[in-house]
Amino acid sequence: MASAMESDSGGGSGGADAQPPLAEVDGGLARVTRQLLLSGDDPAARLRALMPLELGIFGLGDLAQPVLVRDFLNTLTLMSGHAYPAAVLRHHAYYLLRAASFSRRSFGLGHLEAALDVLASSLPPTTASPATDDPLDGSRLIADTRALAAEYRRIIEEGSGEVLAVSGPTATFAFVEELVADTYLARWDAFPREGLSFYAFNAAKTTLGRWLVTVYAETNRYPWAAAGQGQPTAADIKAMAVELVEHSGGRAGGGEGEESGGGGLFHRPESLSSVVASLPLARRRAVEILGVYAEASGGQTPPVAAVPVLAFDAARLRLLEPSGALFYDYVYEALLWDQTYGVPDSVIEAFLAGMAAEMEALAARVQEAAGSRASFSPAAIEQVATVLLSAGLNETVAGDYAMMLASVPRVSRSRWRWLEATAALLESLSGFALHFFRLLPTASPTSRFARVARAAYLRAEAEAKDRRARRTSGPSTPAATAVGVGAVADPWDAVTPLRIFIVPPPAAEYEQVAGDLSSELLRSLLWVRYSRLWQAPAPAPALPCKPPLLPGEQGRRQWTAAVAAVPRTDVEAYCRSLRAGQTARADPAYVRSPFFPAAFIEFQIWPALRRVLSNELPKTRSLAALRWLVSFGSDLALPSPELTRARRPLELIYATVWEIYDGAPPMPGESPQAVGLRPLNLEGEGKAGDAGADGAEDEEGGGPWGLSSHDAVLRIMDAVREVSGIISETISASERAAEAPPLAWPTSLFSLLFTLRYSTTAESLGLATRRFLVSGETLSEDISRLTGAAWRLCSRPLLYDAETGRVQIPLATEEEEEAVVAVKEKSVSSSPRHYSTDLQTLKSVVEGIQDVCRDAAARWALATADTATLRRRLLVPALRESRGIADHPLWAHTSEPLRPDLEELNERVEHALELGYSLTGALRRSVAYRFRDYTFARLFQPPAIDAERAEAIVRRDARPPPVFTPAPRRLPQGGADTPPPLSMDDIMYLGKSICKALVDVLDHHPAAPETTPIKTYTPAMDLNPEQITVTPRSPSVLAAFARTARVQTHHLVPALTDDSPSPVGQTPPPFRILPAKKLAAILLGNGRNASKRRASRDLSPPPHGRWRAVLDSSPFSFSSSDFSDQDEGEGGKADLRGVPGGGGGGEGAYEEERERPSDIDTAARARKVETSCPRRRSPRTTPSPSRRASGGGGGPDRGEAEAHTCPPYLSAAAAASRVRPRTRRGATRRPPRPTAEDE
C-alpha cells in the first residue's frame, strides 16, 4: 500500500495530473449495482446486495470511473421510496468514501483526486455554504479529504517524522486509515532519528567488549550519540580486529582440559559436524573478527568450516562488564552446551550473577519507559525501543536468543547457580522484544493494527502463562535445588508493557456519524462494521420514545387511527401468517400498528431464530431468514424501542454467521495477496460472462473473504443472549405470559459453527502430534543403537600399544553374544577376542558418536519447540474461545449446554510434548552425549609423558620437568548393569555410520593380543600395555517413549471426532468436532459451494503403510539414514543406554518447552501449514540457514550447509566507507548477507 501511494506521491505523476486508467479497475461497485437492480422491491435482497459495501472495502478505481458511480446512484434513485436506500442515496458521498481503499490494487493519490472529482460532480447543486451543520455533507467530506491528501503529501515529502492526525467522520474511511498507517510506517522506518547511547561501549574494559558493541551498531547502521567516547572510525574497527587476532587470539585448540586462563580467544569446539551443537553464535563472532582482520591484513577470509569459535577464559570472563549483558551471546551459548574452556565454576557463577542483575535492571528500565499507559502511545513506543536498542537487543538478536534457548535441553540450565535465572531472563526479554519489534513497523492508530496488536497481546499472555506453568512444574530434584533452579520465579511482567500498542476504538467519531444517519438499519449496520473492525462492543442503541416520534398532532392522529383500524388480534394473526425469508412485501396497515413490534418479536423473531440455531435450515435459507428478520418492514414500521433493540443483535448474528460460512470481508489496510486470500472477484467463482453469475448467485458468491475473527462464535452467543432478554421482556408483558413455553435455545448451529472454525485446526494439530510421536519413536529406535554401542564401547578396558599406535578393543565372545538378550549373566570365555584399530581412528569414532548424539538432541529439541509453538499458535486461541463458550451465561436458556472438547486434544498434545522433553533429557544424559568431553577425555588430553620427560629419564636427570598427573584408573562397576563388550555387529555399524576407517582399512578378523610386553626400554624397566579405562554410566532403557508413542499413534482414536468412544457410564457430550468426511457431508447438505469445500477436506492421517513417506517429508522426522546405513541388527534392539534413572520420565519429563521465533521455520513445514489450513495466512516461508542445514543428516552437503549457518561478519571495507544504504524498518534491521567474495 505504501509503495502504491508513493508511486503517485512524488515526481510529476502525483496529484490531479495523474489520470486513472480508463479500463475497469475493480468490479465491486458494478456488481453491487447489478445486484441492486435484481433485488427489486425485496428489502432482504437489497440488504444482501449492499452488504459488501457495509462490511467490506473496494478499490478507489471504481470511484474514479464516472460511469460506475452514475449507474450506482441511478439505481438507488429508483428505490428512493424506501428508507434504507434513500438514506444511502442521501449520504452517498460518505457511504462510498467509507469503503474505498488503496489496498485492493496499486492505487495512488492521483486516483483519489479523480474519485473526489467524480463524487463532487455527483452532488446536487446547492447555493449553501459547504460549512453546513451536517457532518456527513458531501461537499464538506470532499473538502476535508482533499486537505488530508495534501497534508499526507507534505509529510511524506518532508520526511520529518510527522504523522497524519484525523478526526471527525473522515476517521472512519478505509483509505484514510491507510494514509495514516503510511505516515506511521515512514516514521518507524526512519527510527531511530537521534543517536543511541551505547553505554556498554563506554564501560567496556577490553577491546573485545568495544568490538562487540561496534559490530552491533555498525551492522545495523544505528546512529551514535554525540556524547561519550564517540563513534569508531573504519581504522579503529580494523585496529580492534588486528589486536584481537594477533595479541589475544592464542592457539586454536583447547577444550575442557585446559588450565584456567591458558587459552586464547579462539578455540576449536568439541562438535564440528553438528549444526546446532557446534556453537553457531560463537562461530559467527569469530567469523566477524577474522573477516575484518583478513581485509585489514590484505589476506583472504578463511572458510567458515575452518574458523574456530570465539571462546573465553577466566581472566576475560572477569573483565566482561555487566552493562553489555546482551552482547555476550557466545558465552551463554557455550555454557548451555557445557563448554567451559577450563574456567572454574566460581568465576562462571560470579559472571552469571552479574548478568542476571543487569538483565533485571534492563527489564525495570523497559517497564519504566512503558509507564502505566494502557493504550497506544507513540512516545512510549519510541522510549522502549531506545532502551532495547541501546542495550543491544533488536529483533535479530532476540531471534538468535530464542533459537538458542529452544535448541538447548532444559536440564542444561541446572549446572551452575544463576544459570537458570539468567536463561529465564533472556527468554523473557527476547520474547518481549520479538513481539515488540514485530509490532513496531506497522504500529498506527488504525483498525487493522488494533486487531494485530490485540492478537499479539493475547498471544503474549498465553506464552507467559505457559512459561509460568512449566517453570512451577519444572525439576525439583535435590541437585537442582542446590543450584537454585527450582526456586526461580517469573522474572518480570513481559506482557503489560505491550499495552502501549493497544489502540482504543474511535467511538466518538462513530457516534457522530450514527447520530446523523436517517435510517435505523443503516445506523445499526454502521455499528456492526465498527464491532467487526475494532473488535469492540457497540454502544446500546438510542431508543426512541413512546409514543412513536411522528411530527406533532398529525403523528398522534396517525397512531390513534392505526390502533383503531387494526386490532391487536389481527396484527398478531398477520405476524403468525408471515413466512420468514419468503414474504417480501409488508402490509403498511399492519406494520405501522403499535402492536406490530411485540407481535413480530413473539411470532417471528423467536421461532425463526430457534429454527436457525437448531440448524434445521440449509445455510442459504438460514442467512435469508436472518436477513429477512432484520429488513422486513424496516421502511414502513414506526420507530419502536423493542424492535430496534431486537434487530441490532440480529444484524450482528447475520454478519458473523456470514463471516464463518464465507469468511470475513477484507478490512482496511489488508490486501488479499498480502494475507493469503484470493483476489477480489465480485463477478463470482465462474468464468467471466457466465450466465449464472447474474441471477443465480448464492450467498458465498460475493466473496474474496478471509477467515473470521477468533471470537466470532462468542459474539453470536452474546447477541443471542441480548435477543433473549428482549424476547423475555416482550413475552412477560403480553397476556399469554403464563402460557408461553420456557425460553430455551438449541445448540446445533453453535456446534456446527465451532466445527467449521476449528475442525481444520484440530485435524492438522492432531496429525502434527501423531507425526511428532512417530518421529520420536523413529529417533529413539535409531539413536538407541548408537548409544548402546557407545555404552558397550566404554564398558571394558582398551589396550593401547604405544609403539605401533594400535588400540585393542575387547569384543564379546560367542557365548556373550548369545546371552545378550536372554539373560544378564556373566559369561566366562576362555578365549577373549579383540578388535585392532589405530588411535586416531578411535578418536574419530569417539568424536563422531558425540557429534551425532548432540546433533540428534539439538534437532529433537528444535522439533519439540516447533510442536509447542504450533500448539500455542493454533490451539491456545481455540481453547480461549472454547472455555469462554463453556462458561457463557447463555446456557441458562438452552436445552443442553455446549461443551467443546478441545481440552482432550490439548491434553494429548501436552502429553506428547512431555514425552518429547523426556527424550531430549534422556539423550543429554546418555553416555554418548559427552563421549569425548568426559568419557574419553583422556584421549584428548596432553600425553602423560612427553619427549622432554623421556629424555630426562634416559639421562637420569636429578630434577626432571613436571609431568601431567595421569588420571586415576576408572574401572567399570560390576553387577547386573555392566553391559557385554562390543560385538562385531557394533563394529560394523560404527564403521559404516560414524567412521569408515574403522572397517575399511584394518583387518576384520583380529587375533588375540600378545601376552608378552609390547616394548622393553631397558632390562630393568618394562612398560606394560596402557589400559584406557573409563567410567560407564548406569544403563537405562528408553522403551517408555517408544511404547507410549506407539500406543498414541496406532491405538488412540483421533480426538475431537464422533468416533471417539465415551467412557463407560458417561453420557457423550452433545457437541464434538466432526471428522472431515462427516463435516464435508454436512456442508454439502447445507449448500456450501465448491470453493468452501476445500477448507474441510480430509486431513486424517495416511494409512499405516504410508507413514514412512509422511515422515520423510516431515521436518520433525529423523530417518534411520541420519544415523545408520544398514538395518538394525542385534545391537539396534538395545534401548537408549547410559541414562540414569529409568524410562523416559524422571527429570527429563519436566523439560520446559522453548518457542522458536516465527521466522525460524522450514519451507517444508510452511507448505504443510498452508496445505492444512489453506485459508490462513502462511508464516514466513523463507527457512533460516540453520534450519536448512539441520534438516539434513550429513553427507557431502554438510560442510556447505554448515557454511550457510554462520551469520555474516562485519565488512571492514563497508564500515570504512560508511555508505551502506539504510534499510527499511530501522528497528528490525538485520546484518547484511555475505557476498560471494566474502565467502
From Swiss-Prot:
Subcellular location: Virion tegument; Host cytoplasm; Host nucleus; Host Golgi apparatus, Host trans-Golgi network
Bias kind Basic and acidic residues: ranges: 1151-1170
Keyword Nucleotide-binding among record annotations: no
Annotated Basic residues bias: 1219-1232
Disulphide bridges: none
Keywords associated with the record: Host cytoplasm, Host Golgi apparatus, Host nucleus, Virion, Virion tegument
Residue ranges of the region described as Disordered: 1-20, 669-704, 959-980, 1087-1239
Keyword Nucleus: no
Biased segments, Gly residues type: 1139-1148
Region: Interaction with large tegument protein, residue numbers: 615-1239
The family this protein is said to belong to: Belongs to the herpesviridae inner tegument protein family.
Function recorded in the entry: Plays an essential role in cytoplasmic secondary envelopment during viral egress. Interacts with the capsid via the large tegument protein/LTP and participates in its transport to the host trans-Golgi network (TGN) where secondary envelopment occurs. Modulates tegumentation and capsid accumulation at the viral assembly complex.
Subunit comment: Interacts (via C-terminus) with the large tegument protein/LTP (via N-terminus).
The protein's name in its UniProt record: Inner tegument protein
